[in-house]
């Protein structure tokens, strides 16, 4: 099956894996000094955000089970993906709904709270077709990296296993770096990646981001 990009944030390939060593709500994440040398990434998990967050993705309801997919969606009919449980969802509050059999779906920008296991809505969903996402800052300043492509490929191959339990979504090499999309990061995973691979070799991007004040 082909894969469809489903958000303006350009989240690519993969699926969520939410279990294992995710930090419990309100707990302090372990520090990089607590992790084995070279194994910070995947040993550490960011604490859930205390404030509201925003994410863009596809909401899918299969027989009453509602999830939001912040990564890619298989271009089948109806679409398929593995996502994050979504609480407080009501289709009556949503525009742009499609359905096929017992499956309903739509693409939305969502505001809510994330507790490490589910997203709970705190605002009305906005269809992505009507949503103007804020520009994201490029942490590299547009400067290419210098890591050889062969090393980037090895790093990319490691990331799904290293980050699976901390919300890995996707990764790809570009401009001398590996770009990796995760469900949520407050800087913990970026610091861990810098510890393991060198500063700026791996760029971590969070699908959920703090809501505007």
Question: What is each PLM-predicted segment?
Answer:
Residues 2-14, 21-213:
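OB-fold and OB-like single-stranded nucleic-acid-recognition modules
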């Amino acid at each position: 099956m082909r894969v469809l990009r489903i958000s303006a944030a350009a989240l690519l390939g993969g699926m969520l894996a939410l279990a294992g060593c995710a930090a419990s709500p309100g707990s302090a994440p372990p520090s990089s000094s607590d992790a084995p040398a070279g194994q910070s990434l995947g040993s550490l998990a960011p604490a859930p955000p205390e404030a509201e967050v925003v994410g863009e993705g596809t909401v899918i309801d299969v027989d009453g089970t509602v999830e939001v997919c912040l990564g890619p969606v298989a271009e089948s009919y109806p679409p398929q993906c593995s996502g994050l449980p979504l609480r407080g969802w009501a289709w009556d509050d949503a525009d742009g709904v499609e359905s096929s059999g017992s499956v309903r779906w739509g693409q939305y920008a969502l505001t809510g709270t994330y507790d490490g296991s589910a997203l709970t809505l705190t605002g009305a969903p906005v269809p992505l077709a009507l949503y103007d996402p804020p520009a994201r800052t490029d942490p590299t300043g547009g400067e290419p990296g210098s890591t050889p492509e062969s090393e980037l490929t090895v790093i990319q191959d490691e990331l799904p296993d290293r980050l699976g339990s901390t919300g890995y979504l996707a990764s790809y090499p570009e401009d001398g770096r590996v770009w990796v999309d995760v469900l949520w990061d407050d800087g913990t995973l970026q610091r861990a990646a810098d510890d393991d691979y060198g500063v700026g070799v791996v760029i971590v991007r969070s699908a959920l981001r703090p809501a505007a004040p």
